[in-house]
Amino acid sequence: MNIWTKLAMYSFYETERLYFRPFFFTDVDDFHALASDPENLQFIFPTQASIEESQYALANYFMKSPLGIWAICDKKAQKMIGAIKFEKLDEIRKEAEIGYFLRKDYWSQGYMTEAVTKLRDLSMDQFELKQLSIVTHLENSASQKVAQKSGFVLYR
């Protein structure tokens, strides 16, 4: 079974406090709330000033090719609070990079560490990846802490 079939099998999965699913266009309001706040995506992409920009970003970057991209949802609040995805997934070399972001009102509560740890485990156990990495901005110490708490080693 190839990695794309395995990713399709894991379109939906969960942890203790979170569930992961493909993005829906109905996420646009939650996505815009997240993407229009410059603190949330400071190291990722420019702030989405208008709802139309958020609609475009959601459709083109998160929905167009959904395998390996998940909306992170809070089970209790039943809303989308972030995203986690594979960047540069190489099916032949069996390696990938993980990218992620989270609403700032969910920061420092272990949510992203929970999300990254789960995807790390799935990557090795189910998707049979041999190498996984997280590339962070040099000044993004919060993301570096998430990576380290999730078992990744910091290289500079």
Regions from the PLM with identified roles:
Residues M1-Q42, I69-R156:
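Acyl-donor (CoA/ACP) binding surface of acyl/acetyltransferases
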Residues E39-N60:
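Conserved GNAT-fold acetyl-CoA-binding loop/helix
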Residues A59-A71:
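A short helix-loop-beta-strand connector motif used in the catalytic cores of GNAT acetyltransferases and
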